């Protein structure tokens, strides 16, 4: 069975993004493939069959950046729907965002990330990030400051 194309899909794809924090920096990647090719983003990617979303979060951060993370915690679910010029849905992702603190490793772009680096919170506005990305980064910072996260059972 051929995998379904991500362009013009018949159903949304599940993706996991991770806000990785280290002191006053956040780990960002420059995307190496569509959608948002060449844009700055959070590390993350598609969930594999048989994999929990927490396992996906750990794997994707490690694959794309070489960084290991501590205990990823649920942050938010976001829909990313991108239409073409005719109004047809070209991409549709259901993004499950997590946040985690850095554990080890030096960022280095790999897999489908052209580049990976720590970026100061003060410089996020300069990078042209998607507005939802900035929102989840701020939410993760706030949760880290209060030392807790929403738990779902």
Spans of model-derived segments:
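Acidic, metal-coordinating catalytic segment for phosphate/diphosphate chemistry
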Residues: 1-17, 88
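Active-site-adjacent beta-strand/loop module that shapes the phosphate/pyrophosphate-binding cleft
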Residues: 78-106
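Conserved Nudix-box catalytic region and its N-terminal flanking loop in Nudix hydrolases
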Residues: 25-64
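A cytosolic small-molecule/anion-sensing beta-strand core signal
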Residues: 22
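A short coil-to-beta-strand element that immediately follows conserved catalytic motifs
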Residues: 68-77
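Charged phosphate-binding loop/patch that engages nucleotide di/tri-phosphates or the phosphate backbone
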Residues: 133-153
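NUDIX/MutT-family hydrolases
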Residues: 97, 108-140
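A structural signal for short, well-ordered beta-strand segments
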Residues: 18, 74, 98-100
């Amino acid at each position: 069975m051929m995998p379904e194309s991500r362009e013009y899909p018949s159903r949304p794809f599940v993706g996991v993004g991770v806000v990785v924090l280290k002191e006053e920096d956040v780990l960002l990647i420059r995307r190496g493939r569509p959608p948002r090719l060449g844009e700055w983003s959070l590390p993350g990617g598609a969930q594999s069959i048989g994999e929990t979303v927490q396992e996906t979060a750990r794997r994707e951060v490690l694959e794309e950046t070489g960084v290991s993370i501590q205990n990823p915690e649920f942050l938010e679910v976001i829909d990313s729907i991108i239409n073409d010029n005719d109004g047809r849905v070209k991409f549709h992702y259901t993004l499950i965002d997590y946040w985690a603190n850095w554990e080890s490793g030096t960022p280095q772009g790999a897999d489908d990330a052209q580049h990976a680096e720590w970026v100061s919170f003060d410089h996020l506005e300069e990078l042209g990030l998607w507005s939802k990305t900035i929102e989840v980064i701020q939410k993760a910072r706030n949760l880290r400051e209060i030392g807790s996260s929403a738990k779902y059972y």
